[in-house]
């Protein structure tokens, strides 16, 4: 995979000022972003998150998922610590794209859960790839993370690319009546570590 650094700029946010680093995956043409704060290249494990693009949750305030809540929570946690990195990866809809995500939502409106909808459309349950993270983190001088995630697949993916996950930091945000079944399905079928609140609810909620 050929991922190249393009440019960096300041990014003031309600949480504080970050530096925004732009990267281009030359094979896919996708553009990815890293947001950093503080000195993250000192060798100590860095508080971090891999966040896949979610237009509906991140920008349109959807309550169907927890993505927007997790994005805000991760940025707030980094700002509180004064040091950290968030990789914003262009992998909408767990890798199936925005329009297919809307198609999946339509199937969910008809009774399918989030995994069943993907499978009915001919996709895998989760088609995301995290190979781009290694060159992005290497450019930033980061080799060890305290990773904010509930998804064990992200931990395994980073470790397979020789990035140390020194700690998994749970990031449980935004549970509501609209996403309860979605989160239960992620726990029950995708192995997300969401605690006893969601375990076993996929079939009953």
Curated annotation (Swiss-Prot):
Gene3D superfamilies: GTP cyclohydrolase II. Its EC number is 3.5.4.25. GTP binds at residues 49-53, 70, 92-94, 114, 149, 154. The keyword Secreted does not apply. Zn(2+) binds at residues 54, 65, 67. Transmembrane segments: none annotated. GO terms for biological process: riboflavin biosynthetic process. The keyword Metal-binding applies. It comes from the Bacteria. Binds 1 zinc ion per subunit. Keywords: GTP-binding, Hydrolase, Metal-binding, Nucleotide-binding, Riboflavin biosynthesis, Zinc. InterPro entries: GTP_cyclohydro_II, RibA, RibA-like_sf. CDD domains: GTP_cyclohydro2. The active site is at residues 126, 128. GO terms for molecular function: GTP binding; GTP cyclohydrolase II activity; zinc ion binding. Its cofactor is Zn(2+). GO terms for cellular component: cytosol. It is an enzyme of class 3 (hydrolase). It catalyses: GTP + 4 H2O = 2,5-diamino-6-hydroxy-4-(5-phosphoribosylamino)-pyrimidine + formate + 2 phosphate + 3 H(+). Pathway: Cofactor biosynthesis; riboflavin biosynthesis; 5-amino-6-(D-ribitylamino)uracil from GTP: step 1/4. NCBIfam families: PRK00393.1, ribA. Belongs to the GTP cyclohydrolase II family. Catalyzes the conversion of GTP to 2,5-diamino-6-ribosylamino-4(3H)-pyrimidinone 5'-phosphate (DARP), formate and pyrophosphate. This is GTP cyclohydrolase-2. It comes from Pseudomonas paraeruginosa (strain DSM 24068 / PA7). The gene is ribA.
